[in-house]
Structures are given as C-alpha cells and as structure tokens.
C-alpha cells in the first residue's frame, strides 16, 4: 500500500478540507479519468482497492496512473482505553481529496472498457465521482 518513505513528523493534526482543488484538476497522462466531486479523506487501502478493481477490469491492458497519494497519518487510540495519556499511534495513511481532483487516469483501452473499469474503481471509494475524458483535438 502507498505511504511516505519518511516524514518530518510522525503525527499530524486532523485538519479540515475547505474549498475546491487548486491543482490536479485536468487530465495530464491518460485519455480517461475519475474526478472527485466531494471533499473526503481517502485511505491508502481504498486507493489500493480501487486500483486493483480498475486493473482487473482492464485485463492488464493499457496503463493506470494514481494521481493522489496518502500523506496524512491518521492516529487512533486502542479500544477501551481512557482519554488522555497522549495521542494514539498511527493506524493508517490517508489523502485529503478536494472536489475537482483527478484521482485516477487510464489510457490504452477503449472508452467502454475505461468507463466500466473506473465505475468499478469508484465503487471502492467513499466519495461521489465522475468519469471524464480528454476532448479530441
């Protein structure tokens, strides 16, 4: 699964997701993409599950680009532990996704296969998404 190789600090504040995405809103690599429509924290497991669903549907043809990276450590205290005594340990890594952000791009397959692959990938994500494609020039 995706996670940073090293970080400056082990733990982070929770933070909030405000506004729309500034960058990463256009297709840069592939002909088809999956665009986020809601703000949400997407975990590394969800990104990996979506990637597997997409590549399985494409039958290993074409190419997949993951345009988001889980760089936010999410901490949790063990169950039945009293409050206090410091912050919990890092449980998993997540990525803050803003509306308008391209999450996945694919290329090298027909539109109907791409549409179905991204639909199956979107089912693994906790947000509403939209299928987009590059405008023919």
From Swiss-Prot:
GO terms for cellular component: cytosolic large ribosomal subunit. GO terms for molecular function: rRNA binding; structural constituent of ribosome; tRNA binding. Binds 23S rRNA and is also seen to make contacts with the A and possibly P site tRNAs. NCBIfam families: rplP_bact. Keywords: Ribonucleoprotein, Ribosomal protein, RNA-binding, rRNA-binding, tRNA-binding. Belongs to the universal ribosomal protein uL16 family. Part of the 50S ribosomal subunit. This is Large ribosomal subunit protein uL16. Pfam families: Ribosomal_L16. It comes from the Bacteria. One of its GO terms (biological process) is translation.
């Amino acid at each position: 699964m995706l996670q940073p190789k090293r970080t400056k600090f082990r733990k982070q504040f929770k933070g909030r997701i405000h506004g729309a995405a500034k960058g990463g809103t256009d297709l840069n690599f592939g002909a088809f993409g999956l665009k986020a429509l809601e703000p949400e924290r997407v975990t590394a497991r969800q990104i990996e599950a979506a990637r597997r669903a997409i590549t399985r549907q494409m039958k290993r043809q074409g190419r997949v680009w993951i345009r988001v990276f889980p760089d936010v450590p999410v901490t949790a205290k063990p169950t039945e532990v009293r409050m206090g005594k410091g912050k919990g340990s890092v449980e998993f890594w997540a990525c803050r996704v803003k509306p308008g952000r391209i999450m996945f791009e694919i290329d090298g397959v027909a539109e109907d296969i791409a549409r179905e692959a991204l639909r199956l990938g979107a089912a693994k994500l906790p947000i509403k998404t939209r299928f987009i494609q590059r405008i023919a020039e």
